[in-house]
């Protein structure tokens, strides 16, 4: 067992095109500092969850995996195992250090931007749109996107958008000049790739 100290200065990164970045944010591309202490067993990060795999747990584990891959670029083979009530753990395999840095820097930068401007892509909705994790659907007339957005929508979202998924689509078009699906793909496609690598490594 080891504890990895993460102390990273992140610049640039893979970010979606958002029309308000240059006009509404002050110094949006300044370097960002990420610090953490992450426990690993060899080259594996283990995350335990008593419930089924959730999009938030998957995303948090992915961020930790990227962070250690960047913090220790000379070590290869980093992976994460999410152990849930399912029979098999969910395995994610990290990309190479440079690609991991690019993805991580983009995620951290968008998280920082979203503290100043609305970024309308919560985890459950993104996972539903990309079919990474499908939400519970009460009946066949409710789409996966609507079911995911219903789970995400709360009092924090209410001032900006209703619980109707079509309103989220409208907000994305008006505020971000893009679609929810495009934002979801930006967030989730690298995770899908890491899951595919994990299944091949079993």
What do the predicted segments below correspond to?
Residues 1-202:
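A positional "C-terminalness" feature that preferentially activates on distal terminal regions of long
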């Amino acid at each position: 067992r080891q504890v990895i100290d993460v102390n990273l200065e992140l610049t640039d990164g893979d970010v979606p095109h958002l029309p308000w970045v240059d006009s509404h944010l002050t110094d949006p591309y300044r370097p960002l500092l990420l610090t953490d202490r992450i426990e690993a067993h060899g080259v594996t990060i283990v995350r335990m969850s008593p419930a089924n795999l959730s999009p938030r747990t998957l995303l948090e584990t992915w961020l930790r995996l990227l962070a250690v891959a960047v913090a220790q670029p000379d070590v290869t083979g980093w992976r994460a195992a999410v152990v849930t009530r399912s029979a098999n753990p969910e395995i994610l395999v990290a990309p190479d250090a440079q690609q991991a840095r690019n993805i991580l820097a983009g995620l951290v930068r968008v998280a920082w931007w979203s503290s100043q401007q609305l970024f309308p892509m919560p985890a459950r909705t993104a996972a539903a749109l990309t079919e990474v994790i499908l939400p519970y659907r009460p009946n066949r007339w409710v789409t996966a996107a609507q079911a995911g957005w219903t789970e995400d929508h709360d009092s924090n979202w209410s001032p900006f958008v209703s619980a109707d998924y079509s309103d989220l689509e409208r907000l994305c078009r008006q505020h971000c000049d893009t679609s929810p699906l495009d934002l979801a793909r930006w967030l989730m496609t690298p995770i899908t790739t890491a899951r595919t690598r994990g299944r091949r490594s079993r």
